[in-house]
Amino acid sequence: MKHLQEILETTHKLILAGIGNVLKHDDAVGVYMTDNVMPTSIIHPLTVELSIENYIGKINQLNPDTLILVDCVHFNRKPGYTNLIPIKQLIDHTTHTHNISLNKLNQFFRMPVYVLGIQPQDVSFGEGMTPAVKTCADHLLSLINTCSYARTIAGH
C-alpha cells in the first residue's frame, strides 16, 4: 500500500467515501472503514453506502485534493487482497459489486478519484465481514489513522 501511504503523506484534504451494503457480509467493508477512520483536518470520512450519486454535490462542495472510494471489488484474488487504483483503471480491469457506472461517476468529480478495492470472500445476504476482509480493513485503518494523526500533530 505504498501508493496509499504516498497520498496520505502529501494530500492536504482527502475524502474517504465508504461504499457498500452492510447486509451483505464483506460488501460492508467500505462502510466499516469510514465508520472507524479517525477524522482529522486531512481525512474526511463520508459513509455513502449504496448511494454515492447522492453525495456528488457534497463531495465537490468540500473540494478535496483527492477522493478515495473504499469498496469491495472482485479482483479474482484471495480474500483481503487490496489495491488502490485510479477509477479509470478499475473500469477496464475489474468487476465492481454494485450497479453504479464508475465511468459515468468519474465524470462528475473535479479531483483525482481512486478506488481502494478489497477482494471480498462472501457478499451473500447477512451481517458481519469474514475474518480475512476484516483483518485487511483493520490493517488499512491503522495505516490511514497513523499517517493522518502524525501529519495533524506535525501541522501538515
Which residue stretches match the model-derived regions?
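N-terminal catalytic or cofactor-binding beta/alpha core of small enzyme domains
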Residues: M1-Q121, E127-H156
